[in-house]
Every structure is written in structure tokens, then in C-alpha cells.
């Protein structure tokens, strides 16, 4: 009899939504009611299976890969079905399960092609799970690409008036970025005496400096589109502005996290030598994301576009955390991803609830609806408070950890750290201004003459209340007791930070901060000096 710990849990978790999606066309259903219950049931069952497997068999104190499965799939091209989970991927798997399940529940009123809609949702769910557990570069790329097609169709069919433009822009950006994954991956796989696509093996290989730097840059571009990083972000406001509420929940809650996860897994963990050179660039890009995203959010009159630019700003903290080279900074980056996934999903869902009542996303055409929708107003306010990192909410903990991480880092000069912290703080100050302004325009004051409400405007319904509460409760829980989530990945982030620090320069008795400052201010160092900066001090 098979020991349950040896059961292929990850394969089952990935395959369940995909196989269930393939069965949707044969389900007898005329009005779409059976299909939506079926989709919700499958998503919930998969999420429950995930929780049960991790609860019983996952070792939270270990930084090693667990639930390891590896089978030759297409040996002719070196493609293996190689999956595993560790502290970095496990919390993001749980986030993916929660967001996708709630997004399907949020799509309860979809009547246009319901079979296709729920089928695409389940296929996308399966591919997202595959991205977070893939341990073969080709498998990772396959899952990354499969996920693009459902997102494109969900936007182009069930989106807003400019849905085709937004969907086309999304697919062009992300498909073009995927080329960089393939090129960088092949450069690493074929470098050296052995050819391998195993991610762990790729991390142990020695690469010529030029190949490693170019591969890092390629991954940075590819994953920077998904995160997104300025100036590769312009697809996101359009996609959010036109996507349905469930689509926006998944875009903000899961898709952006795929970019952050991949940056940690590939750029920082697999290519630590190149990370030495790119870390200050990540810090600068993080600051730009924060300030630029906050400033652009001010200029938006569309509610969803304002939230989209807010997401760009919040993802800047992930970049700064990775650049800090500290355990608390990397841990804060992971926590920020989980927190933002929950917060953004709640705000985009509540925006959909508001749009359903007001039939507009333009804030200058709203106003005063807090009087007729007090429960929605209260829930939206709670989500906004979480987004502006109010103490007691998860966002506060994540951002604070990133700030402490970069401020206490010993790899940068004091002046560089001061500039990063101060400019990031400017973005933090701007966040409550544009979020509170958003609340005022939508819920306070008098109703706009251009707002044409139905004769009866219902407040938040039980289904909508359940979805929002399912997102807000973990936000508050993590804010009050961060160890609730950090204990699942602390061992892994400590290992990643320590591994990355091994290649930091400690040469001729000099401190890392002085040499790092030398790299940053004098990029044309002699070749011998550059070589010494990336070697471990003996």
C-alpha cells in the first residue's frame, strides 16, 4: 500500500482543474447554473486538497524541496515532468488557490458562454499552479505560456468596451517577453559540458560572466513585464481597465506574483553572481515603480486604472527587498507579494460590486453612494486601509520589513540607502492621499447628476460579503500576527539571502559597502578588479 506522503500530490493538484475543464463540454446544462457550481466545486476541492497535503506532510522548518516528483516526459527534447514545492512557492500556491476559487465565485453572474468562461478559468488555474512548482526550465516555460491564452480570451471576450485592444496589448507584451525566457534559458542550459534544463542543476553550474549577465538581463526583462517594472508596465492599466472583476482579481492577485516569484527563483537564487551587479539597478527600479506608480494613480479618473497604478507602486517594494541582500528584506518581499495579492483582489472585486450598481468606473461621475451602500463603503474602506499599509494590516508588515532590510543592508553606501529610503517614503506618503481621495470621490459628498442609479440599489449581498471577508480576514490576521505566513517561508528566504551573500565582495580587508559603492559609481573598473568582486573571499 502506498504511503500517502509518497502520493503525487502536486501532479494531482495541477491536473485536477485541467482535467475538470476538459469535462465541461459534456456536462448537461442549458442555463449555465450547473457549470458554475461545477467550476466552483472543482476549484474549492483543489484548494482543499492543497491545504490538506501541506498541513499533513509539509515540513515548515525545512528549506529543502518537498513533494518532489520527477518523470521523463518528452526525453527527446529534455523535457521532464519535474515538480516540487519549497518555502518560496508554498505560500504563493495557497494564494493562487484562494484567489482563483474566490474569482470563480465572483463570476456567478456570467451568462455569456459560461462553459467557455469556467473552462478557461480552470485551465488558467492549473497553469498558474504549474508555474510555481515547476523545477524544469522547459516545464516552467510551458506553464508560463499556457497561462497567457486563457487570460487573453477572458479579457477579449468578457472585458469592457476596449477589451480587444487591452487583450492584444497584453498578449503582445507577455508573448514578446517570453522569448527572453527561452533565449536566456537555452544559453544557460547549453553552457558548459552538460546540457540540462533542471533548475537546481542550472543553479550549480559555473557560467562565463558574459553569459550569466546576459541571461540575468533577459530574465529581468521577461519577468519585469509580468511584475510589472517601469517602463514595461503599460499593458497593466489597460488590462485592468477592461477586464471583468474576476479577471482583475486574478491579474492583480496571482499574475503579478508570478513575475516576483520568478525574479527570486531565477535571478537571485540561480544567478547570484550576476545579482551582485544588478541589485542596485533593482533598488532604483523599485523606487521608480513606487514614486511613478503613485504619481500616475493621482491622474486617473477611472477607478480600476487608479488601482492598477497602485499595484505598480506596491510591486516596487518587492524589487527593493530583493536588492537589500538581507534576510528581512527578502522575507518582506515575499510577504508583500502575498499581502498585495489579497488586498488588490479585494479592492478589484469591490470595484466590480460598485460598478454593478453604478454602471460606471469614472470617479467624477460618482459620489455620495456611501449613503445608499454603507456596507460596501465600509468594506471598501477596509480594503483601502490595507492598501495604504495601515498598522494592523498585512501591507504594513511587508513594507516595514522591506524598509528595515534596505536600511540595514551592508552592501550599499549610506548615501545610496538614504536616497532609496527617502524616495520610497515619498511614495508611501502619496499612497493614502490618492486612496483617500478615491474614497471621497466615490462614496462621500453628493451624487453626481451624471450618475443614473436603478430604482433599487442593493447593498453588498451575502455572496459578495463572503468573498470580501475571505480576503480581508487573512489581511488582518497577517497584520496582527505576521508569523502566520512568515513561518511558512522563513527558512527558505534565510537560505536564499545567505546564498546570495556568499558572492558579495570582501577583498583586501575592505567592507562590502565600500566595494559596492565602487561598483555603483565606477562601472568601468579594470577587468581584474571586476573579477575579484564576484569571487568568494578565501
Curated annotation (Swiss-Prot):
Signal peptide: none annotated. The keyword Cytoplasm does not apply. The keyword DNA repair does not apply. It comes from the Bacteria. The chain crosses the membrane at residues 7-27, 37-57, 88-108, 116-136, 137-157, 170-190, 210-230, 244-264, 278-298, 315-335, 336-356, 388-408, 418-438. Its EC number is 7.1.1.-. GO terms for biological process: ATP synthesis coupled electron transport; electron transport coupled proton transport. It is found in: Cellular thylakoid membrane. Its main location: membrane. Belongs to the complex I subunit 4 family. NDH-1 shuttles electrons from NAD(P)H, via FMN and iron-sulfur (Fe-S) centers, to quinones in the respiratory chain. The immediate electron acceptor for the enzyme in this species is believed to be plastoquinone. Couples the redox reaction to proton translocation (for every two electrons transferred, four hydrogen ions are translocated across the cytoplasmic membrane), and thus conserves the redox energy in a proton gradient. This is NAD(P)H-quinone oxidoreductase chain 4 1. It comes from Nostoc sp. (strain PCC 7120 / SAG 25.82 / UTEX 2576). The lineage of its organism: Bacteria, Bacillati, Cyanobacteriota, Cyanophyceae, Nostocales. The gene is ndhD1.
Amino acid at each position: 500500500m502506498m504511503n500517502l506522503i509518497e502520493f503525487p500530490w502536486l501532479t494531482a493538484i495541477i491536473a485536477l482543474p485541467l482535467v475538470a475543464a476538459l469535462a465541461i463540454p459534456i456536462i448537461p446544462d442549458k442555463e449555465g447554473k450547473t457549470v458554475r457550481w461545477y467550476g466552483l466545486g472543482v476549484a474549492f476541492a483543489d484548494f482543499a486538497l492543497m491545504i490538506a497535503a501541506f498541513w499533513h506532510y509539509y515540513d515548515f522548518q525545512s528549506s529543502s524541496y518537498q513533494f518532489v516528483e520527477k518523470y521523463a516526459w518528452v526525453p527527446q527534447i529534455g523535457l521532464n515532468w519535474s515538480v516540487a514545492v519549497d518555502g518560496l512557492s508554498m505560500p504563493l500556491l495557497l494564494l493562487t488557490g484562494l484567489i482563483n476559487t474566490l474569482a470563480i465565485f465572483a463570476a456567478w453572474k456570467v451568462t455569456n458562454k459560461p462553459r467557455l468562461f469556467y473552462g478557461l478559468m480552470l485551465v488558467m488555474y492549473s497553469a498558474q499552479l504549474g508555474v510555481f512548482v515547476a523545477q524544469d526550465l522547459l516545464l516552467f516555460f510551458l506553464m508560463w505560456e499556457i497561462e497567457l491564452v486563457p487570460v487573453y480570451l477572458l479579457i477579449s471576450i468578457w472585458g469592457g468596451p476596449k477589451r480587444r485592444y487591452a487583450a492584444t496589448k497584453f498578449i503582445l507584451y507577455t508573448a514578446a517577453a517570453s522569448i527572453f525566457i527561452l533565449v536566456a534559458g537555452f544559453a544557460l542550459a547549453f553552457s558548459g559540458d552538460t546540457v540540462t534544463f533542471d533548475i537546481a542543476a542550472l543553479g550549480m553550474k559555473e557560467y562565463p560572466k558574459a553569459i550569466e549577465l546576459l541571461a540575468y538581463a533577459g530574465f529581468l526583462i521577461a519577468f519585469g513585464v509580468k511584475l510589472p517594472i517601469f517602463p514595461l508596465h503599460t499593458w497593466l492599466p489597460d488590462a485592468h481597465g477592461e477586464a471583468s472583476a474576476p479577471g482583475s482579481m486574478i491579474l492583480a492577485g496571482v499574475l503579478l506574483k508570478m513575475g516576483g516569484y520568478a525574479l527570486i527563483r531565477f535571478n537571485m537564487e540561480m544567478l547570484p553572481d550576476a545579482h551582485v551587479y544588478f541589485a542596485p539597478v533593482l533598488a532604483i527600479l523599485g523606487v521608480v515603480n513606487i514614486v511613478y506608480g503613485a504619481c500616475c494613480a493621482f491622474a486617473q479618473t477611472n477607478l480600476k486604472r487608479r488601482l492598477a497604478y497602485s499595484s505598480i507602486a506596491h510591486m516596487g517594494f518587492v524589487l527593493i527587498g530583493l536588492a537589500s541582500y538581507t534576510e528581512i528584506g527578502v522575507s518582506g518581499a515575499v510577504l508583500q507579494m502575498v499581502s498585495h495579492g489579497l488586498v488588490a483582489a479585494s479592492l478589484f472585486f469591490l470595484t466590480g460590486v460598485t460598478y454593478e450598481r453604478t454602471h460606471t468606473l469614472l470617479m467624477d461621475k460618482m459620489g455620495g453612494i456611501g449613503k445608499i451602500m454603507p456596507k460596501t463603503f465600509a468594506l471598501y474602506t477596509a480594503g483601502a486601509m490595507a492598501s495604504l499599509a495601515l498598522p494592523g494590516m498585512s501591507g504594513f508588515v511587508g513594507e516595514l520589513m522591506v524598509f528595515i532590510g534596505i536600511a540595514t543592508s551592508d552592501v550599499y553606501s549610506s548615501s545610496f540607502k538614504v536616497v532609496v529610503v527617502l524616495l520610497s517614503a515619498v511614495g508611501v506618503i502619496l499612497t493614502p492621499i490618492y486612496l483617500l481621495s478615491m474614497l471621497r470621490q466615490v462614496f462621500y459628498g453628493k451624487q453626481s447628476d451624471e450618475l443614473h442609479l436603478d430604482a433599487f440599489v442593493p447593498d453588498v449581498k451575502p455572496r459578495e460579503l463572503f468573498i470580501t471577508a475571505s480576503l480581508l480576514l487573512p489581511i488582518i490576521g497577517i497584520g496582527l500576527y505576521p508569523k502566520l505566513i512568515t513561518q511558512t517561508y522563513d527558512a527558505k528566504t534565510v537560505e536564499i539571502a545567505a546564498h546570495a551573500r556568499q558572492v558579495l565582495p570582501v577583498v583586501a580587508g575592505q567592507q562590502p559597502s565600500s566595494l559596492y559603492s565602487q561598483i555603483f559609481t565606477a562601472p568601468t573598473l579594470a577587468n581584474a578588479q571586476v573579477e575579484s568582486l564576484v569571487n568568494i573571499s578565501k
